[in-house]
From Swiss-Prot:
It is found in: Cytoplasm. Transmembrane segments: none annotated. Manganese or magnesium. Binds 1 divalent metal ion per monomer in the absence of substrate. May bind a second metal ion after substrate binding. This is Ribonuclease HII. It comes from Azoarcus sp. (strain BH72).
Length: 204
């Protein structure tokens, strides 16, 4: 691809899974094709699950390039969630089949990249490429949580997707900490250091 054409390519990057207590943090990078617009792109958190699931395959089909990457639970615990998120973003951009001229990152921090990058606060709502990346990252991570739910239904991961809801914390006290939990996160660390002396009875 000619350098002049590459310089016009904008890549959007976003993540999913910084706040949950378990599972990897997932990042996606998307270069949209101006000739193949996608209606309905928006911040993934503002869309219904049904809308995200409808848009994700369209993004994969119509984008000039896209990639999804992750940082593992072990990397999150070793590096901290911020640095692990930056690592996942680096991996996603590096995995693109097309090199962009500029990368737009949702938020206020940019990972170190081989191409110019700019942080855009609220970019998942204002920049279509970031919106597309947020949808891919969210749908991939949610699918991972649903797969874990099939193996470990007692945690309720299909419902809360790993976020620290009251029901999730109660399930952790009842069933203990599985190996896919982030031990560096406060609620998990607290339970490991101070296991409950008793557990609540499950409601009928």
């Amino acid at each position: 691809m000619p350098a002049s054409q590459r310089l016009r390519l904008i890549c959007g990057v976003d993540e999913a899974g910084r706040g949950p207590l378990c599972g990897p943090v997932v990042a996606a990078a998307v270069i949209l094709d101006p000739a193949r617009p996608i209606d309905g792109l928006a911040d993934s958190k503002k869309l219904t699950e049904r809308a995200r699931d409808r848009l994700a395959p369209l993004i994969r089909e119509r984008a000039l390039a896209w990639a999804v990457a992750e940082a593992s639970v072990e990397e999150i615990d070793r590096l901290n969630i911020l640095h692990a998120t930056m690592l996942a973003m680096q991996r996603a951009v590096s995995a693109l089949s097309v090199l962009p001229g500029e990368v737009l990152i949702d938020g206020n921090r940019c990972p170190t990249l081989a191409v110019p990058a700019r942080a855009v606060v609220g970019g998942d709502a204002s920049e279509p490429a970031i919106s597309a990346a947020s949808i891919l990252a969210k749908t991939v991570r949610d699918a991972g949580m649903k797969a874990l739910h099939e193996q470990y239904p007692h945690y309720g991961l299909a419902d809360h997707k790993g976020y620290p809801t009251a029901g999730h914390l109660a399930a952790l006290r009842r069933h203990g900490i599985a190996d896919f939990y982030r031990r560096s996160f406060g609620p998990v660390r607290e339970l490991l250091q101070n296991p409950p002396l008793w557990v609540e009875e499950e409601s009928a």
